[in-house]
């Protein structure tokens, strides 16, 4: 909660917002979303802790959208358990991550074609192909096109190679 207050609070009434202003940014950041979790094992401990944070944010800041997580891969036990939990908890958006071979991207172009349009929306928060050859770029581009076709389910994405340090 302190993070949200630091980002959005009024420096005249909030010690956290005053710290932000004193650090050189007096205007609020207008934070609208916050991610809780990152490639987590979806077990009872995670669910308990996530629920505590989720409930506290929703109570104090009902306009902030909480983005959940569905584990470290686009399939498997954590993925399935993460999706099940997100639906049960009413998480509005989940963050998926996927690093795969070019072959995987081509063979899974339909990955989001049957996504649940009534459940949590999808943020493909990290994705990329495992190499830097032309075929890898083509596979990623093909997958991006299919994400666009499923834009009612996949509402955001972040292409992992764009996170690289400039000049590195």
Descriptions of predicted regions:
Residues 55-58, 62-65, 83-88, 92-168:
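Catalytic-core region of carbohydrate-active enzymes that cleave or remodel glycosidic bonds
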């Amino acid at each position: 909660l302190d993070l949200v207050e630091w980002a959005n609070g009024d420096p005249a009434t909030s010690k956290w917002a005053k710290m932000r202003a004193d650090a050189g940014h007096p205007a609020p950041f207008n934070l609208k979303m916050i991610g809780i979790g990152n490639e987590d094992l979806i077990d009872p401990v995670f669910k308990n802790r996530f629920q505590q944070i989720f409930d506290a944010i929703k109570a104090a800041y009902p306009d902030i959208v909480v983005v959940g997580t569905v584990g470290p891969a686009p399939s498997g036990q954590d993925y399935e358990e993460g999706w099940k939990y997100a639906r049960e908890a009413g998480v509005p958006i989940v963050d998926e991550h996927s690093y795969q071979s070019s072959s995987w991207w081509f063979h899974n172009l339909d990955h989001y074609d049957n996504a649940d349009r009534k459940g949590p929306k999808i943020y493909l928060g990290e994705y990329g192909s495992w190499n830097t050859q032309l075929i890898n770029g083509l596979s990623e581009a093909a997958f991006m096109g299919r994400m666009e076709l499923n834009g009612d389910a996949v509402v955001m994405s972040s292409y992992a190679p764009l996170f690289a340090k400039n000049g590195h």
